[in-house]
A protein has these predicted regions:
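A short C-terminal helix-loop "cap" of Rossmann-like NAD(P)-dependent dehydrogenase/epimerase domains
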Residues: 145-157
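NAD(P)H-binding glycine-rich loop region in Rossmannoid oxidoreductase-like domains
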Residues: 19-20, 24-78, 82-84, 97-101
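Flexible, glycine-rich beta-alpha linker
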Residues: 103-105, 126-143, 162-163, 198
């Protein structure tokens, strides 16, 4: 949103009433439509006069499969209705890697149905399928850091050997901005991921090493971690990993290491660099400068 505004674009956001991000959005030069993706009037108002639509909404915290399916199916139908009415020039959508109508995971399967609706709509579109993202406030890395700082525990779901490809959210934004302009991206489903293939345990080890905090590594079954996550989410608390993230850990989410470079012309930020400069305050890194492997000033967001 900030980068679109900085580029001189007029931005309108559809945001649920009571959303944690609403007050933050209100402090920026954007138009705000308050409502839900399942509210036809709100969706129509958000789409009215728009040239392009970027669909990022996903009911990740929702545990009830029927609700998830309804949001994916009916929410997409309303968005497409609004997009047709205003004759949008391009419709962008972001989904997790592995999304598809034949997926064994209910979330990815119903998200796949939504993707199919977009492909069949005839509206010029780009679908980005992303590996797990990290950034300030995320569950994958920020949640891990929060748990480690508070308890000294590194909690590893299962064996921790599922292969992942974490991508900094700022790099996903760069892909989106380029997909808005790139004619070669039109009517394609494009996989994107970070610059490294890492297991969950390797991610945890790298983060713990950067924090330099004495830690105890505990492996729990995914079932146990999932139960803890459901209880915490049911209490309105923010667990270090959400239930949906644990589902994705069952299958892994990776693509080619050069996927972003081939499609969008830049190399994503490595995990250690992204954590150092976009999640951890500098005081937590220590007085010796950036961690090994991080070169200060090698690449800024605007250079991507």
């Amino acid at each position: 949103m900030r980068r679109l505004c900085a580029a001189g674009e007029t931005v309108r956001c559809l945001v649920r009433a009571g959303s944690p991000g609403l007050s933050w959005l209100e402090s920026h030069p954007v138009e705000i439509v308050t409502g839900h993706l399942l509210e036809a009037d709100a969706v129509a108002a958000a789409c009215k006069g728009a040239h392009r639509v970027i669909h990022l909404a996903a009911p990740i915290p929702e545990g009830r499969e029927a609700v998830v399916e309804r949001v994916h199916r009916e929410g997409m139908a309303l968005l497409l209705e609004g997009a047709r009415a205003t004759r949008v020039e391009r419709f962008l959508m972001v989904s997790p890697l592995g999304t598809g109508s034949s997926s064994s995971l209910p979330f990815l399967r119903s998200r796949g149905w939504a993707e199919d609706q977009l492909r069949e709509s005839g509206i010029p579109s780009v679908i980005l399928q992303s590996s797990l993202m990290f950034g300030l406030g995320d569950r994958l890395v920020s949640g891990m850091i929060r748990l480690l700082q508070r308890t000294g525990l590194l909690l590893i779901p299962g064996a921790g050997k599922t292969m992942l490809q974490p991508i900094w959210v700022g790099d996903v934004v760069s892909c989106l901005l380029r997909a808005l302009q790139n004619e070669d991206a039109l009517d394609r489903t494009i996989p994107i991921g970070g610059s490294q293939h890492l297991t969950y345990e390797e991610i945890a080890d790298q983060v713990a090493k950067m924090l330099n905090i004495p830690r105890v590594k505990v492996h729990l079954s995914r079932r146990a971690v999932g139960w803890i996550s459901r209880v915490l989410e049911g209490l309105g608390l923010n667990p270090f990993l959400g239930y949906r993230h644990l589902e994705l850990l069952e299958v892994g989410t990776i693509t080619a290491l050069d996927a972003v470079r081939r499609s969008f012309g830049f190399q994503p930020m490595p995990l250690i660099e992204g954590v150092a400069y976009h999640i951890l305050p500098q005081r937590e890194i220590g007085s010796q400068g950036p961690p090994s492997g991080v070169v200060r000033g090698t690449r800024t967001r605007d250079q991507r």
